[in-house]
């Protein structure tokens, strides 16, 4: 077995190369030529000889059996039947053996001639426009192959001429000119045949509409002047064979050097663009050693027959793959063309037949991109080879990256409150189906683990299967044994982040539904209203060990996006623990003192003391708790019960606001009056959802990992138990009364009447009136909301069920209360964001609010508006889910190759971080301490006042150090960042810092790119689709926020005209802000001269006179155009802007994401350069290169005393970034499959399989996580994890 493992390890594919095959290579792959269009015989259903399914070419249909039946056993393996020519081997070879078709004439490859999505490669090599190449290939126009031997030639080399007479007349005029030259030459002998024929052709060409034999004229002209015309792929082939790549390369370089000084300015110039593209293609061909003529096909490979099968349907009908249809047409047309050539048919017929062959070969390769695709009987375009590769249903995404999995099932989920955190209840029928092979193995086993012979329960597999089908009594012990051996994986779609798949130990349950532990629902985003989940069984030892050691649900306490607990109690569980820890005065048994915990329980169960009663508990029974002095703790029965489940060493939990230590006012020491101290002690708030979350964080930080799920399970049990005992109910009569609303509404109505009057008088624009009305009603709702908050915090409502449910964090919030007995408020309406309007105000809110609350009831009109808003909410969610999913996909594709694979890259560059504030209202978006925690410093951090050293250089900032820095009021710090990591592949540990899910240094092999993409993409669905109105004045303008803004940033899209911010282009001081008739003018004095910026009247200016501005500083509010910012201020400013803007979008919606994940993405979007001066390097002008590779190249060139290249930074959006990775497999499986594979083939590119996707495609283990470990290490980790389960 070890030998086998070693053998398989060496089998790992190290790289994959793609190239353009020559005719010789294609013939070498082939096992024979396919000459007939037939597939299988309609009577015998056997493949026809020389046909598309021929056994002699592709291999036998049945294992080790030839076509005629002479050889029928494995013993004949390797022989070839003398009678039918079939090799005796396995039938699986029909999936790999190829055939070929020899074409009668050369044919162009459609990927090389078509312009979209990439420029036509043939057109670039020949320097002929793509339109003209197409005209020649499809036999519309002729191309000049030789301009003749005249001193001043009439035709140019490679000129495309239209001789049909339908279009331009110039070609006929030129031909007449040539003919006149021939006539003039033979003027002396007017009776010669040459002169007569020249005159005859000349006269025919005089009349533009008259047809003439182009072939005859062309041959005549060639004989006498050397001018040669060509048409079709043959002509293109001849030209390609004559191309001298080195010469072309030098010529283009010369051309570029003439205007490379202004290249930056010229980048959009069409001439420069085309020259750069040509240079690129010719350099690729030159370096790859591929002949340019390979772009024209002389042979077509025939794919293996089992990849394009014929399938018999019921009845005598057959269905076949579309590919066979294309091959059939190709063979028929090819054979017909051969015959026509033999018959020496006229050129018109010949050219038409050649064109038809060209078209059908095009259809085979790429049917969809033709103007008129070949269709089936039902008018459906047939699926060509390209269609089989691209898109969601293509080979890459359907068959290689997303396969259907065996040993899996799905069912509806229901709650399983009795389960432990690592358990899942699987229905018995499902267990029997999923674990069937394992159960059968145990049933028929003849030897036990020690090798002793035992009597099998079932004599053979058939009987074992019957026992399982009949659910025999004897199988259940075996089933119990089998399911203990392996956990199962549970997955809920959509899998937005890694917690969407977790492992559990299975338990058999009755019924047909899967039972899920209530604490993992948050991670799966599951609820029990009919959600379904899929179950998968890991098969190999390594998979089982990995599931146990890494994926078990009880290890996933913290969420990856922000390091906050994700396995927190919700709803009933919160309510139960809130009830349990509530304190009340004058309850039964108040003031009793107990010596130990058992006494408390005994008294409670004997109903001698209430669960909320304040009691005393001796600290002597709490031996391991960190008390300074012994005494009696003042607590409640409920809190004593709560503390009984916590680790013994943990501080006694009494006050939710101070969980780390117990305040001395809670302890009665010897000699103090217990009753007096009890009366003085304030009542503490019960433990709500936030407190429970804090407790879990403390547990996770200070105690072994396996302790946390144990406590969580107990919290869950108490939650359900005590929420039941609390018998909390709600009714209409629990809702408090509220009567102040009317006065607010009356005042608002008066104000609206005034605004309307002002609008009619022309003192306000309609936009201003609308904005003020919306603001007014929003203020009314805020006032109502404030009143309601005050009402529900009154002492008389302390025990009100609805208030308790909201206060504990179990369900509901202040906004629900406002709608319930305050007012419903403003509703949103649909709005087309993309319409290009000049109006500054986006009217996506109905300006008449809903003035009633739900308890009062709505009017018909209000009900309509309300339901309209609710329905819009539902459709928005559906829209958002798909858009957010697509964005996650793009993020993953951009960052999937970023893996931690180095301990330290020793960089001295980092980012300077400070608190992020919102420029409009100055509110804090993200504090400095939040930004630096779990990161490494580059420089030491000092207290800015006392100059005391707070943190040394190259030190990890823990949460304690971050707090220390925050207290010292430090304003900025220089820290390590993924953006500046100098590892050539992936990232190093120190640039990333701590893993948020473990609070330890991130491990080598962590696929941090994917985790970053998931952390940014997963909350995407929670972002709103609407445009927010920020600020308070009417002239504030709108800033796109929420999801649309995120898309705008990541796709690097220029903002719309009305939201574009004006930025300073140079450093200077604001001199003045003035206005003229058309705009406001901001005047800035720079070192050299004064600059003026004209901004619209309604723009919000964000600078004041005497302010210092820098390149890229905002002069007006709005969104900055990132490409413009790059030109003005450079890449560092762009990266900083990117980071701050993404964080603003999320934090304004209350979603926390760690900076470092955003930085990983920014790194991927900004780590490419464009070469503008090649120096002595091998680069070419305009080439895109990776920043770290470029840095290495420059260093090497400086060491070698050569002139280094010069490059400028580039920023790519998420649509372009994945295509710029070094892997063509990864890029092709993302988008633009055709373009990427064409480019890669011309380059002769090698994919070294650095990222994850390309390894998955080829069936390798991914180079991350346990992909770095040996099988033995993985299995050992699994065994250790099994011991830790409680």
UniProtKB/Swiss-Prot annotation:
Q: Which chain positions lie within coiled-coil regions?
A: none
Say which domain of life the source belongs to: Bacteria
Q: Which InterPro entries match?
A: DNA-dir_RpoC_beta_prime (IPR045867), DNA-dir_RpoC_beta_prime_bact (IPR012754), RNA_pol_asu (IPR000722), RNA_pol_N (IPR006592), RNA_pol_Rpb1_1 (IPR007080), RNA_pol_Rpb1_3 (IPR007066), RNA_pol_Rpb1_3_sf (IPR042102), RNA_pol_Rpb1_4 (IPR007083)
Family annotation (Pfam families): RNA_pol_Rpb1_1 (PF04997), RNA_pol_Rpb1_2 (PF00623), RNA_pol_Rpb1_3 (PF04983), RNA_pol_Rpb1_4 (PF05000), RNA_pol_Rpb1_5 (PF04998)
Cofactor binding, per record: Binds 1 Mg(2+) ion per subunit.
Record: residues binding Zn(2+) 2: 905, 981, 988, 991
What is its cofactor? Mg(2+); Zn(2+)
Q: Where do the TM regions start and end? A: none
Could you name the Gene Ontology cellular component terms for this entry?
DNA-directed RNA polymerase complex
Please state the Enzyme Commission number of this protein.
Answer: 2.7.7.6
Q: Which NCBIfam families match?
A: rpoC_TIGR (TIGR02386)
The protein's name: DNA-directed RNA polymerase subunit beta'
Which taxonomic lineage does the organism of this UniProt entry have? Bacteria, Bacillati, Mycoplasmatota, Mycoplasmoidales, Mycoplasmoidaceae
